[in-house]
Amino acid sequence: RLGFMKNDIEFLNAGYTKYSAPAKLNLFLKILNKRKDGYHNLQSIFHLIDLKDDIFIKIRYEDTQINIKNSSSQIKPSSDLAFKAAKLMLTNHNLGVDIYINKKIPIGSGLGGGSSNAAIVIMAINKLCKFNLSKINLIKKGLKLGADVPFFINGTNAWAEGIGEVLHSIKIPNFTYVVMYPDLSIDTKAIFNDFKLTNSLIPLKISTSYKADEHDFIKNDLEEQVFKNI
């Protein structure tokens, strides 16, 4: 079993490598239409913020076990995206991995914590095991786990389209955001499933920058549905 360590030094002394998995904000969210596969086409601006989970990873060369511990009791190992990411990367390789995640991004907050964890695990295993997969191939693997994972693998602020996997770099001024967490957990998938589109909407023009005065017009199409589900 994977044990708990008291601090970063103990992890590092035990042979782990530390990684940071950042959260993201959706500066707006426009739902365009629902696809035949059940996903929704959308437009958004994904903005990385400095709220981060700490992830400690150590490759197991002696067996193929995938062991994962999460500081949040809300997440079962078998349903953890980080576990699924490790399994995806190590299938057909005679290797295992120990992963410990110190959660700082609130669960069910819409900040992309699970997707970010999965992205970091994918990139870390690629580096530690010297698989030398390209970023494009890593993004393709990440998309199998969730629509937001490619964004975190890409690692830069982006104008997002498709189901969130079509990314265009965007320049954003150095804004300060106050992120308030009301101690509520919302299932993003359930919110999308419950969302009722009244009609297909016309897409916005792709932007390469985001200005301060545009904050007055930002809107989240899922906001009303979220409050209905609280």
Feature-to-residue mapping (PLM):
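Short glycine- and Lys/Arg-enriched binding-loop motifs that mark or flank ligand-binding interfaces
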Residues: 34, 104-110, 142, 151, ...
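DPxDG-like acidic metal-binding loop motif
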Residues: 109-135, 139, 151
